[in-house]
Amino acid sequence: MMSYIKQPHYAVNGLTLAGTGMDLLHSAVGYPTTPRKQRRERTTFTRAQLDILESLFAKTRYPDIFMREEVALKINLPESRVQVWFKNRRAKCRQQQQQSTGQAKPRPAKKKTSPARETNSEASTNGQYSPPPPGTAVTPSSTAGATVSIWSPASISPIPDPLSIATTPCMQRSAGYPMTYSQAPAYTQSYGGSSSYFTGLDCGSYLSPMHPQLSAPGSTLSPIASSTMGSHLSQSPASLSAQGYGASSLGFTSVDCLDYKDQTASWKLNFNATDCLDYKDQSSWKFQVL
């Protein structure tokens, strides 16, 4: 069984290696481990040995090999023990000198100053994250409040927008265009006052305060449209004109307005601003400059 494990010598690059076979089974039985090196026992010096060593240390702190061997013979100890004793004695002497001269006192002082440095560094680090002054802290909240006041329907004043009311007669859609682009009153008010959608057209000058039917931006034109334009416009909201969609896509200028003189509610473009007609027998619906 062990014949194939213990292989004979073999040739490597034509060179025959002579020798006995190696046991490939690294068992603890076949290879006894070396015993662990025992720790050297602590040397205990007697009073007489210490007196001899101290007398030599008083002469010189660094004895040469001959002095150490001579002292080792006197105290009956190996020279290596004498050498170690001198090394320890020199270290003890240096420690005593440092304590006597006060060189060891600044070390605790340095340790005391290190927490102060850490405190200063922490203070500087915390200073970077100090809260802004009260005036600066209010700025984000005021900005958020301004954003809410623009886009939130609850914060919009219920007062009707003059621009959305005044542009209703001029910008109302006819039956040829389907009424599918209705918007909420809050959304139309947020865009109704923008002058970029109406290039030079000041429809606020044509506001007629004589009709209470247009007091709310979301009210319909059914009382007026039933008598003048037919029932096909009774479901169109008055705030449809303030979308910014019709004004920007049609490209109205300062002289553009829609005419409802025709009862079929057809679009008539490119005529003077003086051609904007009134409704309901020209008696109760008159445009006047405010």
Swiss-Prot record:
GO cellular component, one term: nucleus
Cysteine-cysteine disulfides: none
Protein name: Homeobox protein otx5-A
Localisation per UniProt entry: Nucleus
Expressing tissues: Initially expressed in the Spemann organizer region of early gastrula embryos. Expression then becomes localized to the anterior region; confined to the cement gland anlage at stages 19-25 and localized to the forebrain, optic vesicle and otocyst at stage 28.
UniProt-listed GO biological process terms: anterior/posterior pattern specification; eye photoreceptor cell fate commitment; positive regulation of transcription by RNA polymerase II; regulation of transcription by RNA polymerase II
Short name of any one Pfam family annotated for the protein: Homeodomain
Function, as annotated: Transcription factor involved in anterior and eye development. Promotes the differentiation of both rod and cone photoreceptors cells in the retina. Together with other retinal homeobox proteins, acts as an effector of a cellular clock which, depending on cell cycle progression, establishes the generation of distinct retinal neuronal cell types. Acts synergistically with nrl to activate the rhodopsin promoter. Promotes the formation of anterior regions and represses the formation of posterior structures during development.
Protein encoded by which gene: otx5-a
GO molecular function: DNA-binding transcription factor activity, RNA polymerase II-specific; RNA polymerase II cis-regulatory region sequence-specific DNA binding
